[in-house]
């Protein structure tokens, strides 16, 4: 996603960015899929899965790596769990990150991915909204509490974007927040 200088990447760091980070992200996302932390705030689990997808989108040389990670997470969680509904969020979010990362403005200013993570996290709302519609309660979408869920998903999406940025920055891949990437 970002321009690279020819001499900065060593073989070990390149391997870590292109193979180890995506593989560890898949393992962490799939491993955390069953963890339920009852803190009562909808969308808090994005701090794990979306932040890792954001980090993968920012650190790898090939943008399509994030789609591979999302697809692997979706496939693994579908195999481990009963249905595909909640698992599709990983692939959907990865596809959106892929699209956002390809925008010329984002390639020059990669910190924009942080902001984009907030609305991208709304893919996690697809399953609850579909359940309300399947139940024949279309008015339930606008019910009390749905607006609050949307707001929390946006908040945790932004927080996941910031956390993903921090992870990518910790790997040493990104300019400081607000700096413009070189072309």
Placement of each model-derived feature along the sequence:
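Cytoplasmic membrane-interface segments at the C-terminal ends of transmembrane helices
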Residues: 2-15, 55-61, 98-112, 162-183
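Hydrophobic transmembrane alpha-helices
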Residues: 2-59, 64
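Hydrophobic alpha-helical transmembrane segments
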Residues: 19-24, 51, 63-71, 87-92, ...
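Hydrophobic residues within the alpha-helical transmembrane core of Major Facilitator Superfamily
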Residues: 27, 75-76, 96, 118, ...
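Membrane-embedded alpha-helical hairpins and interfacial helices in multi-pass inner-membrane proteins
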Residues: 107-183
């Amino acid at each position: 996603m970002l321009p690279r200088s020819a001499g900065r990447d060593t073989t070990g760091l390149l391997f870590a960015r292109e193979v180890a980070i995506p593989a560890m992200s898949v393992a962490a996302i799939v491993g955390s899929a069953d963890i339920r932390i009852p803190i009562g705030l909808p969308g808090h689990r994005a701090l794990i899965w979306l932040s890792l997808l954001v980090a993968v989108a920012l650190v790898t040389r090939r943008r399509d790596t994030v789609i591979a990670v999302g697809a692997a997470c979706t496939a693994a969680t579908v195999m481990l769990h009963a249905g595909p509904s909640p698992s599709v969020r990983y692939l959907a979010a990865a596809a959106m990150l892929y699209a956002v990362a390809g925008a010329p403005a984002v390639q020059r200013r990669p910190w924009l991915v942080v902001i984009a993570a907030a609305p991208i996290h709304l893919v996690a709302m697809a399953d609850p909204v579909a359940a309300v519609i399947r139940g024949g309660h279309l008015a339930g979408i606008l019910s009390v509490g749905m607006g609050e869920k949307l707001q929390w998903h946006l908040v945790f999406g932004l927080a996941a974007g910031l956390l993903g940025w921090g992870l990518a920055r910790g790997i040493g891949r990104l300019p400081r927040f607000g700096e413009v990437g070189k072309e």
